[in-house]
């Protein structure tokens, strides 16, 4: 039996897709309890830390040897990408468990709201079905949703209200996102699935600021080699804004502005050129179907 099996059995399934299942646990291991001799009372030594377990389950349509190799490679790169990002100052979940054989990676559970929720895109479902995605640089596979949904604006989300109470505007939030993405791309890592659902806002009482942006779900991350790799990453986020958050052009412009400032003109220029090319290809695909 794999070491991760008991952990998965204790978890609650919160997301399911073609590549992986995600479970939530109140803690990685049962909370230790200390007993005092001569006393009937006891207390826990430490508060439990909620965790997330992502299980890349076996794909029966692949040869077992190939499946095991791909699962191990993707799991290892995800863990290393998170470590590199954290070292570079990008706020990401802490990795607390890696079981390559079972295809399981464990991370701290981020308490807060997704940027999607804050901007009024709605909360993700309790169990979300995700379309299978492969790690490819081809923009046509990364920017699938071309329709812009025109939806009426609803009431302010709980997260947005909390930020407003701290004096934080949507513009401040966009700048924070741009700065976080610049730090990530400086490490030569691309996220691979940049959406507002994969960005969390966590309040930080007593910290250097009232909140922080936490980038999550690095399952499709990869090593960047060319400016176009970064441009595709940005374009995926641009399309996510357009499809989930109507009339958000100014907000995304704020993300790009701060991103460019964080990278510096020398690094930003070639990415900017490629981003324009990627947009043109995306528009052409929309028109031709």
From Swiss-Prot:
<dbReference type="InterPro" id="IPR000719">
    <property type="entry name" value="Prot_kinase_dom"/>
</dbReference>
<keyword id="KW-0547">Nucleotide-binding</keyword>
<dbReference type="GO" id="GO:0005524">
    <property type="term" value="F:ATP binding"/>
</dbReference>
<feature type="region of interest" description="Disordered">
    <location>
        <begin position="134"/>
        <end position="158"/>
    </location>
</feature>
<keyword id="KW-0158">Chromosome</keyword>
<feature type="binding site">
    <location>
        <position position="54"/>
    </location>
    <ligand>
        <name>ATP</name>
    </ligand>
</feature>
<dbReference type="InterPro" id="IPR011009">
    <property type="entry name" value="Kinase-like_dom_sf"/>
</dbReference>
<keyword id="KW-0804">Transcription</keyword>
<dbReference type="InterPro" id="IPR002575">
    <property type="entry name" value="Aminoglycoside_PTrfase"/>
</dbReference>
<dbReference type="GO" id="GO:0000781">
    <property type="term" value="C:chromosome, telomeric region"/>
</dbReference>
<comment type="similarity">
    <text>Belongs to the protein kinase superfamily. BUD32 family.</text>
</comment>
<dbReference type="GO" id="GO:0000408">
    <property type="term" value="C:EKC/KEOPS complex"/>
</dbReference>
<keyword id="KW-0010">Activator</keyword>
<keyword id="KW-0723">Serine/threonine-protein kinase</keyword>
<dbReference type="GO" id="GO:0005634">
    <property type="term" value="C:nucleus"/>
</dbReference>
<keyword id="KW-0597">Phosphoprotein</keyword>
<dbReference type="GO" id="GO:0008033">
    <property type="term" value="P:tRNA processing"/>
</dbReference>
<comment type="function">
    <text>Component of the EKC/KEOPS complex that is required for the formation of a threonylcarbamoyl group on adenosine at position 37 (t(6)A37) in tRNAs that read codons beginning with adenine. The complex is probably involved in the transfer of the threonylcarbamoyl moiety of threonylcarbamoyl-AMP (TC-AMP) to the N6 group of A37. BUD32 has ATPase activity in the context of the EKC/KEOPS complex and likely plays a supporting role to the catalytic subunit KAE1. The EKC/KEOPS complex also promotes both telomere uncapping and telomere elongation.</text>
</comment>
<keyword id="KW-0067">ATP-binding</keyword>
<feature type="compositionally biased region" description="Basic and acidic residues">
    <location>
        <begin position="140"/>
        <end position="152"/>
    </location>
</feature>
<keyword id="KW-0779">Telomere</keyword>
<dbReference type="GO" id="GO:0016787">
    <property type="term" value="F:hydrolase activity"/>
</dbReference>
<keyword id="KW-0963">Cytoplasm</keyword>
<keyword id="KW-0808">Transferase</keyword>
<dbReference type="GO" id="GO:0005829">
    <property type="term" value="C:cytosol"/>
</dbReference>
<feature type="binding site">
    <location>
        <begin position="14"/>
        <end position="22"/>
    </location>
    <ligand>
        <name>ATP</name>
    </ligand>
</feature>
<feature type="active site" description="Proton acceptor">
    <location>
        <position position="193"/>
    </location>
</feature>
<dbReference type="Pfam" id="PF01636">
    <property type="entry name" value="APH"/>
</dbReference>
<comment type="subunit">
    <text>Component of the EKC/KEOPS complex composed of at least BUD32, CGI121, GON7, KAE1 and PCC1; the whole complex dimerizes.</text>
</comment>
<dbReference type="GO" id="GO:0106310">
    <property type="term" value="F:protein serine kinase activity"/>
</dbReference>
<keyword id="KW-0378">Hydrolase</keyword>
<keyword id="KW-0418">Kinase</keyword>
<keyword id="KW-0539">Nucleus</keyword>
<protein>
    <recommendedName>
        <fullName>EKC/KEOPS complex subunit BUD32</fullName>
        <ecNumber>3.6.-.-</ecNumber>
        <ecNumber>2.7.11.1</ecNumber>
    </recommendedName>
</protein>
<keyword id="KW-0805">Transcription regulation</keyword>
<dbReference type="InterPro" id="IPR008266">
    <property type="entry name" value="Tyr_kinase_AS"/>
</dbReference>
<dbReference type="GO" id="GO:0004674">
    <property type="term" value="F:protein serine/threonine kinase activity"/>
</dbReference>
<keyword id="KW-0819">tRNA processing</keyword>
<dbReference type="GO" id="GO:0070525">
    <property type="term" value="P:tRNA threonylcarbamoyladenosine metabolic process"/>
</dbReference>
<feature type="domain" description="Protein kinase">
    <location>
        <begin position="8"/>
        <end position="289"/>
    </location>
</feature>
């Amino acid at each position: 039996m794999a070491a991760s099996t008991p952990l998965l059995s204790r978890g609650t399934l919160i997301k399911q897709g073609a590549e992986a299942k995600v479970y939530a646990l109140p803690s990685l291991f049962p909370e230790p309890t200390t007993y005092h001799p001569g006393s009937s009372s006891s207390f826990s030594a430490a508060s439990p830390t909620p965790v997330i377990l992502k299980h890349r389950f076996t794909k029966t349509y692949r040869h077992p040897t190939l499946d095991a190799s791909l699962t191990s490679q993707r799991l290892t790169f995800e863990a290393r990408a998170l470590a590199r990002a954290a070292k570079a100052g990008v706020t990401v979940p802490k990795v607390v468990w890696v079981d390559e054989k079972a295809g399981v990676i464990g991370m701290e559970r981020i308490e807060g709201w997704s940027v999607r929720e804050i901007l009024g895109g709605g909360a993700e479902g309790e169990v979300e079905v995700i379309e299978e995605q492969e790690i490819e640089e081809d923009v046509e596979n990364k920017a699938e949703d071309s329709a812009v949904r025109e939806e009426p604006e609803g009431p302010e989300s709980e997260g947005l209200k909390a930020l407003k109470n701290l004096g934080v505007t949507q513009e401040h939030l966009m700048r924070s996102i741009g700065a976080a993405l610049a730090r990530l791309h400086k490490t030569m890592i691309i996220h691979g699935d940049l959406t507002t659902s994969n960005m969390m806002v966590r309040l930080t009482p007593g910290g250097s600021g009232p909140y922080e942006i936490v980038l999550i779900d690095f399952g499709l991350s990869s090593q960047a080699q060319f400016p176009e790799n970064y441009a595709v990453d940005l374009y995926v986020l641009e399309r996510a804004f357009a499809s989930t958050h109507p009339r958000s052009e100014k907000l995304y412009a704020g993300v790009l502005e701060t991103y460019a400032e964080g990278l510096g003109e020398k690094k930003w220029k070639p990415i900017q050129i490629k981003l324009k090319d990627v947009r043109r290809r995306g528009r052409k695909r929309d028109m031709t179907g």
